[in-house]
């Protein structure tokens, strides 16, 4: 029995999804807490010039922990310690995102070693803020929910750990 492709869902503006993509894309994002207790936010065109957190796609064969360390280093130049679970969210054809997409947003809260940020070309600005100052910014919706999680739990969540077993990929693995 053959399966027909899932029907393409259109974004609110009528744009079609990425060709060939019929499944959600896993991403990681980090709310970073400095040694002074301030939170790092970045402003990006991808989210309608709203403020959010550094992060991006999880590469094939990469653990979530590896992905968050890589994305944060690429986008901010920061290294992380004490990486803790945050909320897992979904963004399905989110109107704030610049193109039709379906993301599974795997969020973490982590400490940085400092506040010396070097942005790459994905972000236009950054700010270290108190939670109250962060809430006053034009945050994208997923970041607003992540900030609410941080206000409730702080860094008091389980640590994100590497997978206990890593096997080799086999031909035909999806």
Please report, for each region that a protein language model flagged, where it lies by residue.
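Acidic, metal-coordinating catalytic segment for phosphate/diphosphate chemistry
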Residues: 2-31
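Conserved Nudix-box catalytic region and its N-terminal flanking loop in Nudix hydrolases
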Residues: 37-75, 174
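NUDIX/MutT-family hydrolases
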Residues: 118-150
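Active-site segment of metal-dependent pyrophosphate-handling enzymes
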Residues: 26, 77-115
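Short, well-ordered beta-strand micro-motif
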Residues: 32, 107-111, 130
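Conserved beta-strand segments that form the floor/walls of ligand-binding pockets within enzyme
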Residues: 52, 107-109, 138
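Charged phosphate-binding loop/patch that engages nucleotide di/tri-phosphates or the phosphate backbone
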Residues: 144-174
